[in-house]
């Protein structure tokens, strides 16, 4: 019983973001389709070779995507929304880009498909759309072509396919409502055809991803698995693959399926290996997801060995990454600026492949010396002063309930704030950022590269802040912002100014399409060595008599959009960040800033996958926000901002944040999101976004007025604010000016009644 290893997938973008550059060049019309396809081929060949060199036995094929793997699956099944179809019914790479982006070098532009988070990760997928009576057929053969490519290169491969039940679960019905699960029998023949094609190519194992099996699924969906897999059995061996959580609650459903193996995430799930071994059919292969595919930390391989060794020789066993390595940066070896101590704590995708090779060899031979050597830096990290700050740990331990309570209730605070700010009805504001022009980006880059000294940099930033204040005063906005010219990214900026974070040069991970992010890494206890935002906020306030908002990113969002530590709980990290930012609130207040916004766009997306785990998360998430804000005096107005999300099921928690004003993204839902606030009888003030900042379109005065009147039917007008959906960082100044002028005019019209 030789143990093999494999990965569930590998990052697609390339070490230098080659895929991103090729996509964007093609979209801009600067390169041909052939040139784009050649970059994809080169990246796939390189990534297979790198995994093989690092010691991986079975290489994943089908994990590469031109935009997103769920979208690739939609095309495979011939699921192309009518608005994106070619006239002759054919499907090509431009069809795929039109669905993802709303436009491509050929074909008519049309609204892009909806995009949403892939389970609880920071990757986004394109939501499949289903209509009644839909037909499916094998259309886009990218998977088969890539299998042929890998076989021609002499690789031992394991194709990767998103399973039929999870695919339907991830989609949405458009038009006339019906149960999308009823389409299962219509898509299964396409899956049968694909598996038959793979069998023809001599493929032994197919990784069929069914991550929906870790969720608390409705019974009808659980019941659908057996007939679905009865239809798919027999052509190749199927490795039923789950990740991001454990499978124990759904194990009865799983063990009844006619598959030949099961992959389990032993990092994020609480499954017990001995229990799994006992309950799985004895002839099944167990793929143990022991290496974390979605973090950057070196694994304690001695611990991983101990976790699995008792079942070695008792059943067929593979060792694997917990999930696809898509969520991890590619290669640690190119990081030249991290100091040796910190660097020794990390492992990126290629290093994780090496870990799988070490683990496989030790399990096959029983010799664990190499594992102990690899794990030595982890033991050292446990005692490092870079990790532990006794002052932070002491302060966290001393938190009391009082620390998360404002001095008085909202009604008392609102009166003090009205007396202080004397704002008109329908007060107007923006969410925080203004257009990040080429000049601003060049200024920051020159400073970062050392081509510009600190004095000249500060003079340049001050000038941009001044321009933003002048623009807002000219437009007639009531509450101003400084525009965030000094910030590259709302999380990175704070991470750079807090102790306990480090940054990489090339730690890019794909967010969606061509967008990549470089998340900060939390390596130790978090504290604030000096004020972060106070100086620029104070400068902006000195330029105007109108209130200027202080702008902070909230603790839960900073946590969710970073790579967290693994040696303490997420709750601990969030509360440490909250304490650091609490001091920032106090300093802003002392500097005369009377309105402070704490953005928490990630509060909802941080929810655990299982609803039964929600309460505990929301409890500490809300507490972290309140610790951050509660130091503010009654007449300091605390705002928060949240992006597009379903609020209904977390309204209690949103109200519990006790922000004086919440601004939300509502324009794309035509104010429907306000239903939750109305039904809940939300007591504080609210600014429903009146136009979509993701589009260059300028909304008319009438359109904005109509939306606000609609909002006033649900929320009393005296509690409504007027603002765009989101920050204006990605927009140009011409459409920003035009849209804000119309927004201010609409508010003035409503004041006149």
Swiss-Prot record:
HAMAP family in alphabetical order: Meth_synth
Source organism superkingdom: Bacteria
Organism from which the protein derives: Escherichia coli O7:K1 (strain IAI39 / ExPEC)
Name recorded for this polypeptide: 5-methyltetrahydropteroyltriglutamate--homocysteine methyltransferase
GO biological process, one term: methylation
Residues annotated for 5-methyltetrahydropteroyltri-L-glutamate binding in this entry: 17-20, 117, 515-516, 561, 605
Active site feature: 694 (proton donor)
Entries under Gene3D superfamilies matching the protein: 3.20.20.210
Reactions listed under catalytic activity: 5-methyltetrahydropteroyltri-L-glutamate + L-homocysteine = tetrahydropteroyltri-L-glutamate + L-methionine
PANTHER family listed in its UniProt record: 5-METHYLTETRAHYDROPTEROYLTRIGLUTAMATE--HOMOCYSTEINE METHYLTRANSFERASE
Function: Catalyzes the transfer of a methyl group from 5-methyltetrahydrofolate to homocysteine resulting in methionine formation.
Enzyme Commission (EC) number: 2.1.1.14
């Amino acid at each position: 019983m030789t143990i093999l290893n494999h990965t569930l997938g590998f990052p697609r973008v390339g070490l230098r973001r080659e895929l991103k550059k090729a996509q964007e060049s093609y979209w801009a019309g600067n390169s041909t389709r052939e040139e784009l396809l050649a970059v994809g081929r080169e990246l796939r060949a390189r990534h297979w070779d790198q995994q093989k060199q690092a010691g991986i036995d079975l290489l994943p094929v089908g994990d590469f995507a031109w935009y997103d793997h769920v979208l690739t699956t939609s095309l495979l099944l011939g699921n192309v929304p009518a608005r994106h179809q070619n006239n002759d019914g054919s499907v090509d790479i431009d069809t795929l880009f039109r669905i993802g982006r709303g436009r491509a070098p050929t074909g008519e532009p049309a609204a892009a498909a909806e995009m949403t988070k892939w389970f609880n990760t920071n990757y986004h997928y394109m939501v499949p759309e289903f209509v009644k009576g839909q037909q499916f057929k094998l259309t886009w053969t990218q998977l088969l072509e890539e299998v042929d490519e890998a076989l021609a290169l002499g690789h031992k491969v394991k194709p990767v396919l998103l399973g039929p039940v999870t695919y339907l679960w991830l989609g949405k019905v458009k038009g006339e409502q019906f149960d999308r699960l009823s389409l299962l029998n219509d898509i299964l023949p396409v899956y049968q055809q694909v598996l038959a094609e793979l069998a023809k190519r001599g493929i032994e194992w197919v990784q069929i991803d069914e991550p929906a099996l870790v969720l608390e699924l409705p019974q009808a969906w659980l019941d659908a698995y057996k007939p679905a897999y009865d239809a798919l059995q027999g052509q190749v061996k199927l490795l039923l693959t789950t990740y991001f959580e454990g499978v124990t609650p759904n194990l009865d459903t799983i063990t009844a399926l006619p598959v030949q193996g099961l992959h389990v995430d032993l990092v994020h799930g609480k499954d017990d290996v001995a229990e799994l071994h006992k309950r799985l059919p004895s002839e099944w292969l167990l793929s143990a997801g022991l290496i974390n595919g979605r973090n950057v930390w070196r694994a304690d391989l001695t611990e991983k060995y101990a976790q699995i060794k008792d079942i070695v020789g008792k059943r067929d066993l593979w060792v694997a990454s917990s999930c696809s390595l898509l969520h991890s940066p590619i290669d640690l070896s190119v990081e030249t600026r991290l100091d040796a101590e910190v660097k020794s704590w990390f492992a990126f995708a290629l290093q994780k492949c090496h870990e799988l090779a070490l683990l496989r060899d030790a399990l096959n031979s029983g010799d664990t010396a190499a594992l102990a050597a690899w794990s030595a830096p982890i033991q050292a990290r446990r005692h490092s002063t870079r990790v532990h700050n006794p002052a932070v740990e002491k302060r966290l331990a001393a938190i009391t309930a009082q620390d998360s309570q404002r001095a008085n209730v909202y009604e008392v605070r609102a009166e003090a704030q009205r007396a202080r700010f004397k704002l008109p009805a329908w007060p107007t504001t923006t969410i925080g950022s203004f257009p990040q022009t080429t000049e601003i980006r060049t200024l920051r880059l020159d400073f970062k590269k050392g081509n510009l000294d600190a004095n000249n940099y500060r003079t340049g930033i001050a000038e941009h802040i001044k321009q933003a204040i002048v623009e807002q005063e000219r437009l007639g906005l009531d509450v101003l912002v400084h525009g965030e010219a000094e910030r590259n990214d709302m999380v990175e900026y704070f991470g750079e100014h807090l102790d306990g974070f480090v940054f990489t040069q090339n730690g890019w991970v794909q967010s969606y399409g061509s967008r990549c992010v470089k998340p900060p890494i939390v390596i130790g206890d978090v504290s604030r060595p000096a004020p972060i935002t106070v100086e620029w906020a104070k400068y902006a306030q000195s330029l105007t008599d109108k209130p200027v908002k202080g702008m902070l990113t909230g603790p839960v969002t900073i946590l969710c959009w970073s790579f967290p530590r693994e040696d303490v709980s997420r709750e601990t990290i969030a509360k440490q960040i909250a304490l650091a930012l609490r001091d920032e609130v106090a300093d802003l207040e002392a500097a005369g800033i009377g309105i402070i916004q704490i953005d928490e766009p990630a509060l909802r997306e941080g929810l655990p996958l299982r609803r039964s785990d929600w309460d505990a998360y929301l409890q500490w998430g809300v507490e972290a926000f309140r610790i951050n804000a509660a130091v503010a005096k009654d007449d300091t107005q605390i705002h928060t901002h949240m992006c597009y999300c379903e609020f209904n099921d977390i309204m209690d928690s949103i109200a519990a944040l006790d922000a004086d004003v919440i601004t939300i993204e509502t324009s794309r839902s035509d104010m429907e999101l306000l239903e939750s606030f109305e039904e809940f009888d939300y007591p504080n003030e609210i600014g429903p976004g009146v136009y979509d900042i993701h589009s260059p379109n300028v909304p008319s005065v009438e359109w904005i007025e109509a939306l606000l009147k609609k909002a006033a039917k649900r929320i009393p007008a005296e509690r409504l604010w007027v603002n765009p959906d989101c920050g204006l960082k990605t927009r140009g100044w011409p459409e920003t000016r035009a849209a804000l002028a119309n927004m201010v005019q609409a508010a003035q019209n409503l004041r006149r009644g």
